[in-house]
């Protein structure tokens, strides 16, 4: 069956404590680890936080599986490909833009083989920082799975649909949707045809919904629209299954004789989820001025400093612009934060040329940026009538309080060397 025809069942809500059974009666009642689990399953806890973390931040799940995860051969180092550990990044304060990262169809590769680190800061070993990756894939992961010891993946498909099998069940994630797969969760990705997208990986805190403050109880990304899988297991024995682990930026491999997707039931609040970006309820000025992009925050991964994020996931979705006496495109800016932008589809409102779907840009801490010359001069002459950012346009930003370096691959490949020229048409227009 084609991926577009597949539809899965989900549970609704963000951060909920769920329970799910693929076979009725397989969840123990009133306890987590009975002497003998129903149907003689194994009980296994997956912890997303320290045991002593404050209760309101505590994330963990109990999984009831046919065989425990520990049954595998020793993990051995393998070629990490274009995934890097952030120890030897290039420093470049310039405005950077990348042309679309190609999908090499002449070299069939799966999701893990197509991971490419672009930028990052901090390190997984100290549980602080983030990494930004591109992924491409032309084939599915057959008898192969992946889990990440370093951090949580926020995955943004740009081209193609991901059919993701996890220990917790299945998710179908298409372009225009996102998913989060947290540290330690085993998953496998199936694709049909050329596939590409972006990943923001956070090493410290987990993603959460931003506080709404004076906005109130509703708006932006609503909790009910986040979907988590329901239990779905497969009993495969006597096979050769390869499990890949990312550990401190390096890849390791082990084999096992059974499918890791053998969880018959589970309960808890540490589980993957997906979200449809078209459900984002936009808040904006209906009088004057261009408000700050924080109003478009979908998810945030906070640092220990209140109000400061290791990573914010921000989108620039279809919406109405109605401000009076206002320069409506994004303003010229020097930011204490780092801004990595990508384009899912369409045209970004501040860059009419050169910023393409599947590419990206990085504006680092205090590096000036803003609308290009053509956008600026068009905006200051435009009739200020209500205008719709079209439905075909969808850009996003990974914003971080950390100063990002770029990988060797990103430094040497697909850089738009002429990016700086898009501002050179901005002249002295003053009447002084």
Swiss-Prot record:
It comes from the Eukaryota. It is an enzyme of class 1 (oxidoreductase). The keyword Ribosomal protein does not apply. It catalyses: homogentisate + O2 = 4-maleylacetoacetate + H(+). Keywords: Dioxygenase, Iron, Metal-binding, Oxidoreductase, Phenylalanine catabolism, Tyrosine catabolism. It holds the Pfam family HgmA_C. Belongs to the homogentisate dioxygenase family. Pathway: Amino-acid degradation; L-phenylalanine degradation; acetoacetate and fumarate from L-phenylalanine: step 4/6. Fe cation binds at residues 333, 339, 369. Its cofactor is Fe cation. One of its GO terms (molecular function) is homogentisate 1,2-dioxygenase activity. Its EC number is 1.13.11.5. This is Homogentisate 1,2-dioxygenase. The keyword Amino-acid biosynthesis does not apply. The gene is hgd. It comes from Dictyostelium discoideum (Social amoeba). PANTHER family: HOMOGENTISATE 1,2-DIOXYGENASE (PTHR11056:SF0). GO terms for biological process: L-phenylalanine catabolic process; tyrosine catabolic process. The lineage of its organism: Eukaryota, Amoebozoa, Evosea, Eumycetozoa, Dictyostelia.
């Amino acid at each position: 069956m084609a991926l577009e025809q597949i539809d899965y069942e989900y549970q609704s809500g963000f951060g909920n404590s769920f329970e799910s059974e693929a076979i009725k009666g397989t969840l123990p009642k009133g306890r987590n680890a009975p002497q003998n689990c129903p149907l003689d399953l194994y009980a296994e806890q997956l912890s997303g936080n320290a045991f002593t973390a404050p209760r309101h931040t505590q994330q963990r799940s109990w999984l009831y599986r046919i065989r425990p995860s520990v049954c595998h051969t020793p993990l051995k180092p393998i070629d990490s490909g274009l995934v890097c550990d952030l120890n030897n990044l290039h420093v470049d304060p310039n405005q950077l833009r990348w042309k679309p990262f190609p999908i090499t169809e002449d070299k069939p590769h799966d999701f893990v083989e197509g991971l490419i680190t672009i930028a990052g800061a901090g390190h997984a070993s100290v549980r602080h920082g983030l990494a930004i990756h591109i992924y491409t894939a032309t084939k599915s992961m057959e008898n192969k799975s992946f889990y990440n010891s370093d951090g949580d993946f926020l995955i943004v498909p740009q081209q193609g649909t991901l059919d993701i099998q996890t220990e917790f069940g299945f998710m179908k994630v298409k372009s225009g949707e996102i998913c989060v797969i947290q540290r330690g969760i085993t998953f496998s990705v199936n694709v049909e045809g050329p596939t590409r997208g972006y990943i923001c990986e956070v090493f410290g805190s987990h993603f959460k919904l931003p506080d709404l403050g004076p906005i109130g109880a509703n708006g932006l990304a609503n909790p009910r629209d986040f979907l988590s899988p329901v239990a779905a297991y497969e009993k495969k024995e006597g096979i050769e299954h390869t499990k890949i682990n990312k550990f401190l930026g390096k890849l390791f491999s082990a084999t096992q004789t059974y499918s890791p997707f053998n969880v018959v039931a589970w309960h808890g609040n540490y589980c993957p989820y997906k979200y449809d970006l078209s459900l984002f309820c936009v808040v904006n000025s209906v009088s004057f001025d261009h408000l700050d992009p924080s109003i478009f925050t979908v998810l945030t991964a906070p640092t220990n400093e209140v109000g400061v994020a290791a990573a914010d996931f921000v989108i620039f979705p279809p919406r109405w612009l109605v401000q009076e006496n206002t320069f409506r495109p994004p303003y010229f800016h020097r930011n204490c934060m780092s801004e990595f932008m990508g384009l899912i589809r369409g045209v970004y409102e501040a860059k009419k040329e050169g910023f393409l779907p599947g590419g990206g840009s990085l504006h680092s801490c205090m590096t000036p940026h803003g609308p290009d010359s053509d956008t600026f001069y068009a905006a200051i002459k435009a009739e200020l009538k209500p205008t719709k950012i079209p439905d075909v346009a969808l850009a996003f930003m990974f914003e971080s309080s950390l100063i990002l370096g770029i990988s060797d691959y990103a430094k040497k490949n697909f850089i738009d060397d002429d990016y700086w020229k898009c501002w050179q048409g901005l002249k002295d227009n003053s009447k002084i």
